[in-house]
Amino acid sequence: MTPQVLTILGSTGSIGESTLDVVSRHPEKFRVFALAGHKQVEKLAVQCRTFSPEYAVVANAEHAARLDALLKRDGAATQVLHGAQALVDVASADEVSGVMCAIVGAAGLPSALAAAQKGKTIYLANKETLVVSGALFMETARANGAAVLPIDSEHNAIFQVLPRDYTGRLNEHGIRSIILTASGGPFLTDDLGTFDSITPAQAVKHPNWSMGRKISVDSATMMNKGLELIEAHWLFNCPPDKLEVVIHPQSVIHSMVRYRDGSVLAQLGNPDMRTPIAYCLGLPERIDSGVGDLDFDALSALTFQKPDFDRFPCLKLAYEAMNAGGAAPCVLNAANEAAVAAFLDGQIKFTDIAKTVAHCLAQDFSDDLGNIENLLAQDAVTRRQAQEFIAALG
């Protein structure tokens, strides 16, 4: 069997580390061509020593020099690259068959689009790619024969319970709606009066999942679920009015599909990202992920509730942006990234995140986003507007 040749973008993040864990269990199936780790030089050096990629990519020349010195000390042959163009190069290299797109935020868009243009199998963990450029990205993938496989646990669950011959038309398959589950985050039952005093340290402690800091805050505001709604809209060609969100605090049911005959098909499992990663990497077979069996005896109850927009205004803003279409999702994402970064840096309150996003969505913006240059220009404009609003908050 010829091994699949992988580029893993975001290898030092939680998704990247989980991917490498799965890859390490199947050395006969996978070969790592390139790893990209932004600024975590020491962790990336360990990964390079373990997986011997041809290339490693970091953010800038300073980090590249540090990584190169570490690798040369150990006699590693990995070539070190840096910068945004290097990400594009390793994502689109002829040797590569599959690209794990796990860079956080809109920064992951150019490399994901480059992989689509070269017809790669794209393991999509970067939801912002579809939020910011859904129409452009999916059309590019279709035009070049690129397969887009969802890594997000919710979208992967949907992917698993949709018909194998799903055409992107719900009615043809008797589907009434697609249901995304959400944990509700760490503040689901907290008094709303305490939200102004929520600290970054509290917000990054997700009750069920092991995730990075930014996505953990997004989970706490439920903006993460809002971004996933927009992602599902593009991945599954699903009209906004056929997408539902239900809060399920135990994170055992990862998502569901509601059918016309009254059936609801769900995918269950322990909350561990290695399951969706292994599912996509192993297609069409099921491969070992290292995840333990779901223990039904240990499950006391599975509960569900509707999301409360007063508690989660970011989810409401995401619904509005999805329904508005055009540039609104791009603006939503850019404003949120700026606001979350400011919150994590101690500049604004937890409740100011939604205020910042709402302010940016109220500004005038163009819907002419037919190319990556216009998308990135709008992204930059919105970030500037968000930063100005944040500065005015004092």
Describe the function of each predicted region:
Residues 1-394:
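Catalytic, metal-anchored helix/loop core of enzyme active sites in primary metabolism
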